[in-house]
Amino acid sequence: MAFLKTLNPLLRRSPTPIPNPRSLLSLDAFLAASSPTAASHATAPAPFAAAAHHHVPIRSGGPLFLSSPPWMLSQSATPLTAAAAALRARLRRARALAGGGAQAVADAVGWEPRRISRDESEVAEAVTGGRERFLNLPNLVSIGRMASGPVIGWMIVNEWYLPAFGTLALSGASDWLDGFLARKMGINSVFGSYLDPLADKVLIGCVAIAMVEKDLLHPGLVGLVVVRDLLLVGGAVYKRASSLGWKWNSWSDFVNLDAIHREKVKPLFISKVNTVFQLMLVAAALLQPEFGTEETQNYITVLSWLVASTTIASTVGYGIKYRQIRPRR
């Protein structure tokens, strides 16, 4: 207590006044302490001495106008409104990415998904699903029947008549099997409607040409069948090109019948009858070298005339159908 009484008079007689602790936190004190000439001009009056009684606390990291005098503010300082808006935008993005879902993310970034029309969605679905439609089980059966044609022809040329007959019987049964599977599986493939008759034509053509080589069928009859099949295949290609307006980006677009301009091929009834007679004729002619007689040869002759007549009738029928559906210019 005596020490404090002794110290108090000494402090009052001191020539250097002790600054007020609150003034040390004022704006003028901060500027004086941070100025390089603060030591030499400590007693000089401040230019804005009139405002020295306003003591503003220093807030580190706050806005610029609280930490600098007006003449030192930069024009590039970020306004509070812009900073607050940017902060709110960042918070929205953070909440969206943290678990707000796809719609919240879209709202945060200002993205609006484009509405896809029904036609565009159907085309996209057909294009992306083209491989699945092409590689279904009924189409694979048709492809197998088509591939068996050259194999059976090779067997006939090498006089393997019985193996050729057995393979032909299986291939003929597959003509019924692919349609049965398509109905049971609910598959309605436009490509399959083209592939099924094409497989029949390749099979019959390869077998018939090989049988002409071995004098098992008349060349005129085989020529009639082959020409008719070529005309039908050419007509199918022409029909597909016409449906596309003779414009397509690539051959994949042309052969992808399940994508755009879907139009199935519907064979005539007379054409189905012709296919049955052709298979019967080829099977009977294959058995003729091993088990044939003069009587069976007569049956083969009758079947040959039936095949010729139904071939001509189906060709005429397709010609009439083409003229009916052909657009008039």
Swiss-Prot record:
Residues 1-38 form a transit peptide. It catalyses: a CDP-1,2-diacyl-sn-glycerol + sn-glycerol 3-phosphate = a 1,2-diacyl-sn-glycero-3-phospho-(1'-sn-glycero-3'-phosphate) + CMP + H(+). InterPro entries: CDP-alcohol_PTase-I, CDP-OH_P_trans, CDP-OH_PTrfase_TM_dom, CDP_ALCOHOL_P_TRANSF_CS. It is found in: Plastid, Chloroplast membrane. Coiled coil: none annotated. Its EC number is 2.7.8.5. The chain crosses the membrane at residues 150-170, 190-210, 217-237, 300-320. One of its GO terms (cellular component) is mitochondrion. Keywords: Chloroplast, Lipid biosynthesis, Lipid metabolism, Membrane, Phospholipid biosynthesis, Phospholipid metabolism, Plastid, Transferase, Transit peptide, Transmembrane, Transmembrane helix. Its main location: plastid. It is a multi-pass membrane protein. Catalyzes the committed step to the synthesis of the acidic phospholipids. Transfers specifically a phosphatidyl group from CDP-diacylglycerol to glycerol-3-phosphate to form phosphatidylglycerophosphate. This is CDP-diacylglycerol--glycerol-3-phosphate 3-phosphatidyltransferase 1, chloroplastic.
